[in-house]
Design a protein with these regions (language model features):
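"…together with the soluble PPM/PP2C metallo-phosphatase catalytic core" -> "…together
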Residues: 2-257
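Cytosolic, membrane-interface loops and tails of multi-pass inner-membrane proteins
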Residues: 30-53, 99-101, 263-294
Length: 320
């Protein structure tokens, strides 16, 4: 970080870092969006054609801005440095798919997500224990590292993909991600967890706010897989660092239901020939727009309100 000389108060450096991350994200997106690939419109999405022609893949801008801000202003050790690299790797897999004339296959993307998830699990276990804390109920349990690694891979892979599937309405996945990671930030402080990654949460949140400045309805550009996949892995790492990974089920509840329901529905139909929720369009944000006739703004606000209520209740339970 730039404060290696100790010449400045850490709180001042942190304050400047937050302003820097937001400002540079806004400026970079304004100047560089013309160089991004153009969206082709999602054929099967509700109002997918409205996105056609918009710059896509803006995740590459706000993710690189976040990483630069983290290196300059956060207390980055080797573990956090590796996480930053993995976030960039996941972002790049999404960006190259965004920029490709022919979209990458589902199996290729799923395999790359799996590889990244395995690396996250190995790195986390190298620097941390295999103890799972129960932040709400109290107590903890130590499980064999191999089992912990398997659960971590599932968590990371699932987080990447449900977050990616939730990216279909202007401002939705970005807003939900901010609520999720800020809930994790509050829980970290309640639990007394103060490390370099805790501050990285704030930097990532303000970079997302800089992106949302342009992505609010009607959006001028889209984050693409470059943004959604990076958000997914960031959420997973952030919740792992709380030491209570099961909190993911609550702090990311709306993302899980919105994006995960479609994944489950597709997997059951494709591999087991079981057709569930025949009258429900997935992701759920498309069902809300198509079947319930919600506007984009209503989807974002109502989904956000639901997650905020769950998050507030979760924080309260952790504090008890």
């Amino acid at each position: 970080m730039i404060n290696f000389t100790g010449a400045f108060d850490l709180s001042i450096v942190a304050f400047i870092g937050i302003l820097f991350a937001f400002a540079i994200t806004c400026i970079a997106i304004a100047r560089l969006n013309q160089y991004l690939p153009k969206d082709m419109g999602r054929k099967f999405a509700h109002d997918g054609k409205l996105s056609a022609g918009k710059p896509r893949g803006a995740g590459i801008i706000f993710v690189f801005t976040f990483v630069i801000a983290a290196v300059l202003f956060a207390q980055v050790n080797l573990e956090i440095g590796i996480y930053l690299c993995l976030i960039v790797v996941e972002m790049l897999t999404g960006y190259f798919d965004d920029a490709a004339e022919k979209p990458w296959g589902e199996y290729l993307k799923g395999f790359l997500d799996f590889v990244v998830a395995v690396v996250v699990a190995v790195v986390y276990l190298h620097y941390n224990s295999s103890v799972i804390n129960f932040a709400i109920f109290g107590g903890s349990v130590t499980i064999p590292p191999v089992f912990f690694a398997i659960l971590t891979v599932i968590l990371v892979w699932a987080s990447i993909n449900v977050t990616n599937c939730s990216d279909g309405v202007d401002g939705l996945s970005g807003t939900l991600t901010i609520i999720t990671i800020m809930t994790i930030f509050v829980i970290d402080n309640v639990l007394g967890i103060q490390d370099g990654f805790n501050y990285c949460i704030l930097l990532f949140a303000v970079c997302l706010l800089g992106y949302l400045w342009y992505n609010a309805t009607p959006s001028k550009l889209l984050m693409g897989d470059a943004g959604s996949r990076a958000m997914g892995i960031f959420i997973a790492i952030a919740v792992l660092k709380t030491g209570s990974p099961l909190l993911y089920l609550l702090v990311a509840a709306v993302l899980i239901v919105d994006g995960g329901l479609g994944l489950i529905k597709l997997a059951l139909l494709r591999y087991l020939k079981i057709h569930i929720l025949k009258n429900t369009t997935t992701p759920l944000h498309d069902h809300a727009r198509k079947k319930m006739e919600w506007s984009n703004a209503q989807v974002v606000f109502r989904f956000a309100i639901i997650q905020i209520v769950i998050s507030v209740a979760t924080v309260y339970l952790v504090m008890m």
